[in-house]
Amino acid sequence: MKTLVLVAVLGVASLYLLSSASEVQQLSPAEEEFRAFVSTFGGLFETEERGVDSEDCRAMFGGCGEDNDCCLHLGCKTTKLPPFANPYCAWDGTTGRK
């Protein structure tokens, strides 16, 4: 019984060492060059969507005057019953990147 437990513990330890050794993988020069190339484009792939990464966009249930005041995937809504005052930002039914 002691031998079986010892073998099991050694097996788990060897699997741990093998998995941690595979995580410590060095990048090839081509991979490093590709990552540097992609990072040079910086903001090229960023979109000009309303409210994306905008500090002045309004969050959920924040006051608004129009859809552009609200953050991404939020639209300016009003209550359906009178009074129609106090519009707020609410989910506009979209998901993902536009």
UniProtKB/Swiss-Prot annotation:
InterPro entries linked: Huwentoxin-1 (IPR011696)
Keywords: Disulfide bond, Ion channel impairing toxin, Knottin, Secreted, Signal, Toxin
Database matches in Pfam families: Toxin_12
Role according to the record: Ion channel inhibitor.
Protein name: U10-barytoxin-Tl1a
Broad class of where this protein is predominantly found: secreted
Species of origin: Trittame loki
Keyword Signal among UniProt keywords: yes
Tissue distribution: Expressed by the venom gland.
GO cellular component labels: extracellular region
Superkingdom of origin organism: Eukaryota
Record-level Gene Ontology MF annotations: ion channel inhibitor activity; toxin activity
Domain notes: The presence of a 'disulfide through disulfide knot' structurally defines this protein as a knottin.
